[in-house]
Amino acid sequence: MSSKIVREPATKAVADGTYHIKNGGYYLAVNPDRQIIIQQTVYAWTVFVDGEYNYFKDPKTTHYLTDNGGQNVLSPKADVDGRWGNASVDIPTQLINAETERSLGVPYGTPSDTWILVQV
C-alpha cells in the first residue's frame, strides 16, 4: 500500500492589503506623470482581490494598473484591463492580465519578467 504526499501549492495568493510589487531590488512604481516605472525606492500599492484576480491601485491617485493596448498605464478600476492573475507573496511570478493575457511589462526602467508581492 502506497501513500501519496500531499503538498501545498507552490505560491500563496495575496489578500486585500498594501503591498510592494518587487523584483530583486526594484519596485513597481508610478512617477509624477502617472507613468508606470521601476525604481529602487520602495513604492506601495493597494491590492484588492476579486475572485481569482487582483486589482492594483496606486494610492497616490484614484487609478489602477491596467494593460491598455499592450501598454501598462493607470486607468479607472472600471476598465476591464485592470484585472491581474498569478500574484504571489512567496514565489516571484509573471503577473498576467486577465483580459489581454499579456504579462506585465514596464516601459520606463529595468524590465522584469517576474514579480513578488511583499505586504507592508
Swiss-Prot record:
Residue ranges crossing the lipid bilayer per the database entry: none
Compartment annotation: Secreted, Cell wall
Broad class of the protein's primary localization: secreted
Alphabetized UniProt keyword annotations: Cell wall, Secreted
Propeptide stretch(es), residue numbers: 1-12
Keyword Secreted set for record: yes
GO CC terms: extracellular region
Tissue: Unripe and ripe fruit bodies but not in mycelium or ectomycorrhizal roots.
Role played: May play a role in the structure of the hypha-forming fruit bodies.
Name of the featured protein: 11.9 kDa wall protein
Species: Tuber borchii (White truffle)
Species lineage: Eukaryota, Fungi, Dikarya, Ascomycota, Pezizomycotina
